């Protein structure tokens, strides 16, 4: 749960299981990642589409749209299923189910992926595998030295140029 949403016991149990594995110095297996991440993606993507529906009723907003940030597995699924999304900036580094890597092969919109190279919680090889899997002909991996909170100030400027190029082309 978040905000006014009720907590979901099964998610709390899965998060506790993940925490236990990580605190013990282990790596979560694919089954745990699937049981934790995929149900969250299944819930979050329709909610995100509902938010996008509501936002696009505002006169100052129009298609095409871009998405930025958040949980990368949600972003991959959303980019795959929602035709209104023309470009995406995604933050690499979280646990990614194999099914999401498979879905990434069908994501063909322009992508800008931010990867903090020294993020202790980052699963760098998974991030690289996911980036490689994307089906987009235009994809950029911006890998920066630094931890989770070490994103350089100019990284936002790069993302702004990316979205300007794809959402507001000149000519």
For the regions a protein language model found, what residue spans apply to each?
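Alpha/beta-hydrolase active-site loop
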Residues: 3-59
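Short beta-strand/loop motif that positions the catalytic acidic residue
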Residues: 107, 113-115
């Amino acid at each position: 749960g978040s905000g006014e949403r009720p907590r979901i016991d099964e998610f709390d149990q899965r998060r506790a299981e993940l925490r236990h594995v990580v605190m013990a110095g282990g790596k979560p297996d694919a089954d745990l990642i699937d049981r934790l991440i995929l149900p969250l993606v299944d819930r979050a993507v329709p909610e995100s589409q509902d938010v996008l529906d509501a936002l696009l009723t505002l006169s100052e907003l129009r298609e095409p749209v871009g998405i930025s940030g958040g949980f990368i597995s949600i972003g991959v699924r959303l980019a795959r299923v929602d035709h209104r999304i023309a470009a995406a900036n995604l933050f690499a580094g979280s646990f990614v189910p194999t099914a999401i890597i498979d879905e990434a092969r069908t994501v063909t919109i322009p992508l800008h992926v931010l990867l903090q190279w020294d993020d202790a919680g980052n699963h760098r090889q998974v991030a690289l595998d996911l980036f490689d899997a994307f089906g987009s002909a235009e994809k950029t991996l911006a890998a920066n030295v630094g931890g989770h909170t070490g994103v350089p100030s100019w990284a936002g400027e790069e993302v702004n140029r990316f979205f300007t190029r794809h959402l507001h082309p000149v000519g």
